[in-house]
């Protein structure tokens, strides 16, 4: 009778929520699946539940307990997540390799105008005074300047206001099943299961973006497992509702991947003479001293007091020339801190926006 009751409950829930695209596992037997196994059945929605079981089998191999895996039912196929992922991919225009690239001299400027508004700087100033205690604690503990923690918090989740309302397991399983980036999203699905298995959060609270990024930090599950930190000593790593933990996690991430709190991110420069585009980039062998760059005509764009202070700090370290819009747009000399921001998000546009946002926060607040 108990098995019939469980089955009836599952069927009723399926009817309410939309049937075939909902995983309703009640069996305790989840066979292990090799890490390298490839799903061979057609990627049609009627196979989605079977694919979820396939991923759970891989999670068994990764050490996730059967009890945790069996408790995670109602994993749904989210069509909107697939649509958003494909739309994002569609914004990257494929060009004919036999044709020269189309250059956009305003790419960096357009991006900054969109994401780094005066209103965002105003909000950052207001929020700074509200979160000063947890922000300073994270800054001091992990040796990361406050303005960079605040800038990442503001950019990633709009100061904690936008965290996403998607069920993370469903989003990750959906995007893995879609196949465009299966290796990434299947790995993140298993890492999300590990989070649940280690009691970091309850499933009902594990909400995030359509791509599975979570909390005020917008960490993917792998980033959570590697960098999430307990900022207030309560034993939890709550990046969703606890600012002590959110700021500690941001700072721990940067610190772990090589942040130096004695350095700024970089400065904007002007090129007073032609310079080969091949010299730009963040590869280690492209680093030069400030003196070497200046000898090649790379000069500060601004001579404000803030930029001069940054220039002094940058005069004792390796620097890289960054030209996000290739040979036609703006240029920047950046420190290794810029490279650590790229570890967070590999977009040069994003990294420049974080650096400039941090500069404006520092200037506005007087840090």
Language-model segment annotations:
Residues 1-8:
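Bacterial N-terminal signal peptides that target proteins for export
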Residues 17-18:
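C-terminal motif of bacterial Sec signal peptides marking the signal peptidase cleavage site
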Residues 22-130, 136-139:
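An acidic, Gly/Ser/Thr/Pro-rich helix-cap/linker signature
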Residues 59, 68-80, 145-160, 192-195, ...:
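Short, functionally critical alpha-helical segments immediately adjacent to catalytic or ligand/cofactor-binding
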Residues 78-85, 157-166, 178-182, 198-204, ...:
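Secretory-pathway/luminal and periplasmic proteins that interact with or process carbohydrate-rich
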Residues 113-126, 174, 179-186, 200, ...:
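Substrate-binding clefts and substrate-entry loops adjacent to catalytic sites
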Residues 203, 207-314:
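Flexible, glycine-rich surface segments
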Residues 269-367:
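C-terminal soluble interaction/assembly domains
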């Amino acid at each position: 009778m108990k098995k019939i009751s469980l089955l009836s409950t599952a069927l009723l829930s399926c009817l309410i929520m939309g049937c075939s695209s909902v995983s309703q596992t009640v069996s305790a037997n989840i066979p292990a699946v090799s890490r390298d196994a490839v799903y061979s059945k057609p990627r049609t929605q009627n196979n989605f539940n079977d694919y979820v079981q396939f991923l759970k089998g891989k999670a068994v191999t990764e050490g996730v307990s059967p009890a945790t895996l069996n408790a995670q039912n109602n994993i749904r196929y989210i069509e909107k997540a697939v649509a958003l992922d494909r739309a994002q991919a569609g914004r990257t225009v494929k060009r004919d390799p036999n044709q020269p690239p189309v250059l956009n001299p305003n790419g960096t400027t357009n991006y900054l105008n969109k994401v780094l508004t005066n209103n965002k700087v105003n909000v950052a100033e207001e929020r700074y005074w509200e979160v000063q205690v947890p922000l300073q604690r994270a800054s001091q503990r992990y040796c990361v300047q406050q303005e960079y923690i605040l800038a990442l918090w503001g950019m990633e989740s709009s100061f904690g206001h936008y965290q996403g309302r998607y069920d993370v397991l469903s989003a990750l399983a959906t995007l893995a099943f879609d196949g465009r980036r299966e290796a990434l999203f299947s790995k993140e699905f298993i890492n999300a299961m590990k989070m649940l298995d280690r009691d970091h959060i309850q499933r009902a609270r594990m909400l995030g973006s359509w791509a599975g990024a979570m909390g005020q930090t917008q960490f993917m599950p792998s980033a959570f497992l590697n960098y999430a930190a307990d900022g207030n000593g309560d034993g939890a790593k709550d990046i969703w509702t606890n600012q002590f933990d959110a700021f500690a996690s941001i700072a721990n991430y940067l610190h772990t991947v090589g942040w130096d709190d004695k350095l700024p991110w970089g400065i904007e420069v002007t090129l007073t003479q032609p310079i080969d585009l091949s010299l730009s980039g963040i590869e280690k062998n492209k680093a030069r001293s400030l003196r070497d760059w200046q000898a090649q005509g790379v000069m500060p764009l601004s001579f404000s007091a803030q930029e001069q202070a940054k220039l002094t700090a940058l005069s004792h370290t390796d620097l890289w020339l960054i030209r996000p819009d290739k040979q036609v747009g703006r240029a920047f000399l950046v420190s290794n801190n810029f490279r650590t921001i790229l570890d967070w998000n590999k977009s040069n546009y994003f990294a420049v926006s974080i650096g400039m946002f941090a500069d404006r926060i520092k200037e506005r607040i007087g840090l």
